[in-house]
């Protein structure tokens, strides 16, 4: 009996010394700065994209915070084949136009376009040049467009969004993952999305805080975010 009583504290001491371990956060640790968009797209491995297919030769995804939706798709004469907005891409009248690979994104919360980045005066359309959309082609990246009202992304996940519609049916691209289609690549990182034509040196980054438009292989950067942080 005496041996049993003495053995219990020893066993408890052994358990307490082996089972309990604590990690403390280094107060001096400084997380690395986010990579520039083109570098992020180059360095992160491409993920499997089959689960993100949205039909009709389109790959589409939303970010985990439901602030950005993107379609890696095609355009004909400015008509985009996207699964979340009405479009006339399939009209036979557009068959005369060349098919161009593009990435189109919409944001629920977004910054205004910088004055120097307004790409259209919207003359004669009765529309305004608004933010909340971005379009990547193999040669350029443009933030904003001529439109009125809200985008589908705003309608579903904006301040008064319904959280129900075509965007809500799309799958997530997880933070830090890359996806590629037709020579264009996208990455969800730094609470936003970067997409680009890596070989052409053209890219963009968008988030609710701001945007970057990158050209000339990273030598030219425009937009409301001069640096990512």
Locations of regions flagged by a protein language model:
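Hydrophobic helical h-region of N-terminal Sec-dependent signal peptides
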Residues: 9-14
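Extracellular glycan-recognition/adhesion modules and their associated mucin-like linkers
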Residues: 53-67, 71-73, 115-116, 175-181
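Extracytosolic low-complexity repeat regions of secreted or lipid-anchored proteins
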Residues: 166, 170-214
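Bacterial signal peptide processing site
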Residues: 21-24
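A low-complexity, Ser/Thr/Gly/Pro-enriched, surface-exposed linker/loop concept
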Residues: 28-51, 77, 82-170, 202, ...
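C-terminal motif of bacterial Sec signal peptides marking the signal peptidase cleavage site
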Residues: 16-19
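Bacterial N-terminal signal peptides that target proteins for export
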Residues: 1-8
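Extracellular/lumenal glycan-associated surfaces
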Residues: 64-77, 181-201, 225-229
């Amino acid at each position: 009996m005496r041996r049993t009583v003495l053995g219990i504290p020893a066993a408890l001491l052994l358990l307490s010394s082996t089972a309990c371990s604590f990690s403390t956060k280094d107060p001096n640790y400084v997380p690395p700065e986010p990579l520039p968009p083109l570098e992020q797209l180059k360095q992160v491995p491409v993920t499997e994209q089959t689960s993100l297919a949205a039909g009709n030769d389109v790959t589409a995804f939303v970010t985990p915070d439901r602030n950005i939706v993107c379609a890696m798709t095609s355009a004909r004469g400015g008509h985009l084949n996207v699964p979340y907005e009405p479009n006339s891409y399939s009209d036979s009248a557009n068959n005369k136009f060349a098919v161009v690979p593009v990435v189109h994104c919409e944001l629920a919360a977004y910054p205004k376009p910088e004055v120097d980045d307004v790409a259209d005066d919207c003359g004669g359309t009765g529309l305004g040049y608004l933010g909340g959309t971005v379009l990547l082609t193999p040669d350029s990246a443009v933030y904003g467009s001529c439109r009125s009202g809200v985008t589908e992304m705003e309608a579903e996940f904006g301040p008064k969004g319904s959280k129900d519609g075509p965007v809500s049916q799309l799958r997530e691209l997880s933070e830090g993952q890359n996806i590629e289609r037709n020579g264009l690549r996208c990455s969800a990182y730094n609470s936003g999305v970067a997409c680009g034509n890596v070989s052409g040196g053209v890219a963009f980054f968008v988030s609710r805080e701001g945007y970057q438009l990158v050209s000339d292989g990273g030598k030219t950067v425009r937009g409301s975010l001069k640096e990512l942080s």
